[in-house]
From Swiss-Prot:
GO terms for cellular component: cytoplasmic microtubule; microtubule organizing center; mitotic spindle midzone; nucleus; spindle microtubule. The lineage of its organism: Eukaryota, Fungi, Dikarya, Basidiomycota, Agaricomycotina. This is Protein STU1. Residues 802-815, 824-837, 856-871 have a biased composition (Polar residues). Residues 138-161, 538-612, 637-711, 748-839, 853-884, 1077-1111 are annotated as: Disordered. GO terms for biological process: cell division; mitotic spindle assembly.
Length: 1242
């Protein structure tokens, strides 16, 4: 119950205080302050007497009395001053506030700090009692204008000044005084008031005072002024007008550039600590500085990246920037205006680096003018070209309005004799073609006119632009080109002119562009090709990337503007006698067989039946390349068009050239042979180099059998080349996909039913192939899939032992194998002497399964294949802990935008704990008290910091394999011994401690401990199920940093854990989470109208969701996206086995009322499709889906590019594999971005 003081009691205290000596006053003040702690109100009659007696007490030389008044009395007395009427507060501001402001200059910190706190209290009371009047109603002296509404009620004889303005006037007097400490403390008071009152306290009146303090003679004042300005103007809630006014004042009052640069960078960048280049504060832009410089003088800015960032505060600030530049671009360029022109161009580039074109795009585009590229001086023209290259990249389609005006100007520059300017200008044209979306008529007319020019340099650049245009725009602009009268004829005429050009370099580039033209307009291209003479047509066919035997220049050259003579170099052609080539192949095969016998003596060999020839090798062609709207996009296109060969049907019209084999390792044998090599590197990759893994087999010799068509040979076979990243590139012909899966549960080894798919290929005369499964294999596949549909729980079966522990290969070449068995490149020791490819008989292969091996089949990109027990491979070679957390993994996670707040917080907490880190690694008993506190559930911040530092200073390396030396094993045992008896206690204690209801600071530090454990002690982690439960429990938090931490941690666990084991754990944790957080009852459950039911599920505003619903959606989204990431690391057989369970998860999520959950369900379905590449099989996992839902799922597959291609449009094997890897990478990024939407930001 609050205490009350009567008027008589307060008057008695006041009387004692007036009559007492200074020492006695200290006791009275302190006692009265204690009485006021529980008092809510004082009698109004005693307020003014105390306010009048306070100034002498505050100015008293008695230090103890002064300290008592400031610390023990004022914090409790001032809040009791009544706000209404305001006469008491006005008296306090007139009497007490000046005395308090004087004490800001006191040398003792306890004095000036307490005085500052009292001033803040008076300011808060002033703003609460009388909100400030808008500045428009005040005159220059601070008094009310005569016509304002408030002045009509005020006393006409004495203008009325509001309480906030009275408080501000006194504080400004202090800031404009001479005492440096008063200024410093006054700015601190100002910062506190702004943080408390927010927008109610205007900034404009303070900016002039603060700018003056930036140039104060005292260094302490200047430093505090910088910090104050940054703290006041950097928050996002600060109005842009205040920042713009501040920039104007910096220039108007000539603040030093070093001071202004630092402040502007910190205020406007949003991440000033990460900036290495200060902003350009060109306050003298309007002055004709350097007008007398001679033409030979080189300006300071001459490099593409030597541009300082320019930060723009508001659209009005941007308009002023452009307005100050306009006078320099009026009229012709002269000796007087070329230097300001260059500075203006560089400044515009700096604005783009500061993202002004993104924040204020409309104002930026309105300010752009087209006369900046007309300069003929080298540096100025070069800067103009840099700007014109960056503008389309940054603005994209918003730059379309300038394209038609700029292309003729840049086209003229392509004929300049100054090679540097010509190259830069045409690089800008390439950027415009790549990133803008204007009508193709503009580009085609510009390119066609360039091809008609007499200058060979212009023609060379024009055909490069023609190639770029066809790569970027031909596919999607085909209808526009054909619908525009005469446009397709103009394009055709341009090709005819360029193919007949007198310059060989122009003709060479045109031939490369022609085949892209041929893909889009095949009939017109055929007519054009048939009209050429024999020699020209022969050269054109030789440039066809589908038939060229050696890599041609890639389409990446379209974005470069090299010299025209660079295209004159022709690929060397070599001929070799057929007999010599065959003899060399036989010799290489024999040597490889001997080497394989010596290396793998006693090991089983898997020998497949011979495979007939398949279509020849061709180079990858860019088909249907989408137009990119960014530099990243064009880089992706260039990568797609790299000269790495892939296999696809060869047109029958082109002849296959014979090429010699450069090395014995690349010689192919008539038989597909798979040899398991015992090597220390076998667990990761074979000893083949990446170049060999990517190298294509050479084109076959002419047919030796009448039954084989042109380009087919009995020497054609299937070889498996292990790539450097663990992926296998399978040759053409009959392809067996091994799908015998080895999975384990609680250390026991099991096998899932074998599922072997084979593609029978039937070669046609036109080079295309129809692939279908043989009836027997299709029947077996259907049986396996049907049996798996009825499984409700994960079922791990023991394989039935084969008689004699052998597998036999059938006459159709069906070889059972497992993804966990290493398949290395090699050839057989003895080859059948047969030229027709018919081999009778069977090879019996012995294969003993290793009962201790553990491996979940991964997808081709991420799997490390295991061999059988005949190869001496240690158990648990590919366990959930085969690889440690590498710096590359951590760096890749830190670069993601979605969890930036967590990484900043983690670094901040690690830096705070660094003083506790000992110089040498501490012994294990040093953290025993900290572990005990953690187990009790009540650790302090220091306990958690010490545990985190101990984890980082005692890392444990991955468990060494049997092939590694004893020293590595001893080092592992020593590192592991440190954690004996400690690790389980730390891990379990941390996971149990991490609960959303914990203190935020302790919870964040606990997350740091968990990250240190995963990063440095991952080989010791056994219970990932407990860890998953803990992560789902943290999804109940509403703190964005905690949620971001769980997102980043699960992304890391997907990379380093066994995906099958993690998938089971995530499923279990998701079920547990959804059981704890059931879905709210749906009001539309009984609604028979499907349209009304669908509309009722739409959430028009996220603010309408209850906290329980937001928590459920956050965890649900987290689980679905995590499962999707695991799916992308699994192989097709495992997905087939787990499909029904995954389908049940998808179906439940698709029917969820939340749109974000439905979106996550479709993303999970897309992840499954990325692995299976069969939409029918994918949709069969969710049989309960309606036809409309299935159609929507297929639509999403097509839009995301994961829908399989059939018939004539089906990609070749190697090209398809490359595309599938890209699909998985893109889908992983999409899932990570979708997961970030579950972060609740309040």
């Amino acid at each position: 119950m609050p205490k009350t003081l009567t008027e008589s009691e307060v008057e008695a205290t006041f009387a004692k205080l007036k009559a007492a000596d200074p020492d006695r006053k200290v006791d009275i003040i302190q006692f009265f302050g204690l009485q006021l702690e529980d008092v809510e109100e004082l009698p109004a009659s005693v307020i003014d007497p105390f306010l009048l007696i306070l100034p002498p007490l505050i100015r008293s030389p008695h230090s103890l009395l002064l300290s008592s008044v400031l610390s023990s009395f004022l914090p409790y007395f001032l809040p009791l001053i009544p706000k209404h009427p305001t006469t008491h507060l006005r008296l306090a501001l007139l009497q007490v506030l000046p005395a308090l402001l004087e004490k800001l200059n006191d040398a003792k910190e306890r004095i000036h700090s307490a005085a500052g706190n009292a001033i803040v209290i008076l300011g808060e009371l002033s703003w609460e009692a009388e909100p400030p009047i808008p500045a428009s109603n005040l005159n220059s002296s601070g008094s009310l204008k005569a016509g304002s509404l408030s002045s009509s009620t005020a006393t006409k004889s004495k203008p009325h000044e509001t309480l906030p303005h009275l408080w501000e006037r006194h504080l400004k007097d202090v800031l404009q005084g001479k005492a440096w400490r008063s200024k410093v403390e006054g700015m601190k008071v100002l910062t506190k008031m702004r943080s408390k009152e927010g927008a109610k306290m205007g900034l404009k009146a303070w900016l002039g005072v603060l700018v003056d303090l930036l140039e104060d003679g005292d260094g302490n004042v200047r430093d505090q002024a910088r910090e104050t300005v940054v703290e006041l103007l950097s928050p996002p809630s600060t109005p842009p007008a205040a920042r713009s006014e501040f920039k104007r004042l910096l220039v108007a009052r000539n603040v030093r550039k070093t001071i202004a640069d630092d402040i502007i960078t910190r205020i406007l960048s949003g991440e000033g600590s990460d900036r290495s280049t200060p902003a350009v504060m060109n306050s003298e832009l309007g002055k004709e500085e350097g007008a007398s410089r001679s033409g030979a003088a080189a300006p300071a800015h001459s490099q593409a990246d030597d541009v300082d960032i320019v930060y723009v505060a508001s659209p009005q600030d941007l308009e002023r920037e452009f307005h100050s530049m306009l006078p320099f671009f009026e009229g012709k360029e002269t000796e007087e205006n070329w230097a300001p022109r260059e500075r203006s161009i560089v400044r515009i580039r700096g604005m783009m680096k500061g993202q002004a074109h993104v924040k204020y795009q409309a104002a930026f585009i309105a300010g752009l003018k087209g006369g900046i590229v007309l300069s003929l001086r080298t540096t100025v023209a070069q800067q103009s070209c840099y700007l014109l290259k960056e503008l389309p990249e940054g603005l994209g389609a918003a730059f379309d309005n300038f394209v038609e005006f700029l292309l003729p100007i840049l086209g003229k520059m392509s004929g300049f004799t100054k090679k540097l300017i010509a190259d830069r200008s045409q690089t800008a044209v390439t950027s415009i073609i790549t990133h803008t979306t204007v009508h193709p008529r503009i580009f085609i007319n510009h390119i066609s006119s360039g091809i008609q020019e007499k200058n060979v340099q212009i023609r060379a650049y024009s055909v490069n632009h023609l190639k770029t245009f066809l790569i970027v725009h031909a596919s999607h602009a085909k209808h526009q080109i054909e619908a525009t009268p005469g446009l397709s004829d103009t394009l055709d005429a341009a090709f005819r002119k360029a193919l007949a050009d007198v310059n060989p370099g122009v003709r060479e580039v045109t031939r490369q562009a022609f085949w892209r033209y041929h893909e889009v307009w095949r009939s017109k291209a055929e007519v054009l090709m048939n009209s050429l003479d024999g020699q020209a047509r022969k050269q054109l066919e030789k440039a066809n990337p589908r038939t060229a035997a050696s890599p041609m220049p890639s389409y990446a050259s379209s974005s470069s503007t090299g010299a025209p003579s660079s295209a004159n170099t022709k690929p060397p052609s070599k001929k070799m006698d057929l007999k010599a080539m065959l003899a060399e192949r036989r010799r290489a095969v024999k040597e490889a067989g001997k080497q394989a016998q010596e290396t793998n003596a006693g090991s089983p060999r898997v020998v497949s039946n011979p495979v007939f020839a398949s279509p020849g090798v061709q180079h990858a062609s860019i088909t249907g390349l989408p137009r990119s709207s960014s530099a990243v996009g064009i880089a992706r296109h260039v990568e797609t068009s790299s000269p790495s060969p892939v296999r696809s049907p060869t047109p029958s019209s082109s002849a296959t050239r014979i090429r010699p084999s450069p090395s014995p390792e690349r010689i192919q044998s008539p038989i597909q042979t798979k040899i398991e090599i015992d090597s220390p590197l076998r667990s990761r990759y074979t000893s083949l180099t990446p170049d060999l893994a990517r190298s294509p087999p050479k084109s076959p010799s002419p047919s030796l059998s009448p039954s084989l068509g042109l380009g087919e040979s009995p020497l054609r076979q299937v070889l498996t080349y292990p790539a450097a990243n663990g992926r296998h590139s399978v040759g053409e012909g009959k392809r067996a996909i091994p799908e015998l899966v080895e999975v384990a549960d609680n250390g026991a080894e099991h096998e899932v039913d074998e599922l072997t798919l084979k593609e029978g290929q039937k070669t046609r005369d036109d080079g295309n192939t129809d692939q279908e499964l043989p009836p027997t294999v299709q029947e077996e596949v259907d049986q396996v899939e049907q049996s798996q549909q009825f499984e409700s729980e994960p079922r791990l079966e023991h394989p039935e032992p084969q008689q004699g522990n052998t597998f036999s290969t059938s006459t159709s070449g069906r070889v059972p194998s497992t993804p966990a068995r290493s398949i290395a490149t090699g050839t057989t020791a003895s080859l059948p002497n047969s030229r027709n490819g018919n081999i009778k008989g069977e090879k019996i292969i012995s294969s003993r399964l290793n009962p201790e091996a553990f491996q979940t089949p991964l997808n081709p990109k991420t799997s490390a294949l295991r061999s059988s027990s005949a190869i001496r491979t240690p158990a648990w070679k590919d366990s959930p802990r085969p690889e440690a957390v590498t710096p590359q993994m951590m760096q890749k996670l830190k670069e993601r935008r979605h969890e930036r707040s967590w990484w900043v917080k983690r670094q901040e907490l690690l830096e705070k704990a660094s003083p506790l880190k000992p110089l040498t690694p501490s012994p294990s008993f040093a953290i025993l008290p900290d572990i005990e506190a953690l187990e009790l559930g009540a650790p302090t911040l220091k306990n958690l910091q010490k545990i985190a530092l101990f984890c980082s200073s005692h890392p444990v390396r991955p468990e060494p394999t049997a092939e590694q030396d004893e020293e590595e094993k001893r080092a592992f045992e020593e590192e592991k011994r440190v954690w004996t008896g400690l690790f389980d206690r730390v891990m379990n204690g941390v996971v149990d401690f991490l609960r959303p209801d914990k203190d935020k600071e302790l919870l964040e530090q606990g997350l740091v401990v968990l990250w240190e454990i995963v990063q440095h002690q991952w080989p010791l982690v056994d219970d990932t199920q407990r860890l998953c439960h803990g992560l789902f429990r943290l999804r109940e938090s509403s703190d964005a940093v905690v949620l971001e931490s769980t997102n980043a941690l699960i992304s890391l666990l997907v990379q380093i854990s066994d995906p099958m084991l993690l998938l089971c754990n995530l499923r279990s944790s998701l079920d547990r989470f959804l059981t704890k957080h059931p879905a709210p009852p749906s009001s539309s459950a009984d609604n028979s109208d499907p349209m009304t039911s669908a509309l009722s599920q739409l959430s028009l505003s996220s603010s309408k969701e209850s906290p329980e619903k937001r928590t459920r959606n956050s965890g649900y989204l987290f689980g679905l996206t995590s499962i999707g990431m695991c799916v992308l690391r699994l192989s097709a057989p495992v997905i087939v086995s787990e499909g029904p369970k995954l389908g049940q998860i998808v179906m439940e999520a698709i029917n969820d009322p939340s749109s974000i959950i439905r979106q996550a369900a479709h993303s999970l379905l897309l992840a499954i499709q990325c692995v299976t590449h069969d939409s029918r099989k994918t949709l069969a996992f969710v049989p309960a889906m309606s036809q409309g839902q299935k159609d929507l799922a297929v639509y999403y597959m097509a839009q995301n590019g994961v829908l399989e291609q059939i018939g004539l449009h089906k990609k070749a094997t190697s090209e398809g594999e490359k595309g599938r890897e890209g699909d998985r990478d893109n889908m992983t990024g999409e899932l990570a971005g979708l997961m970030s939407r579950g972060v609740i930001r309040e």
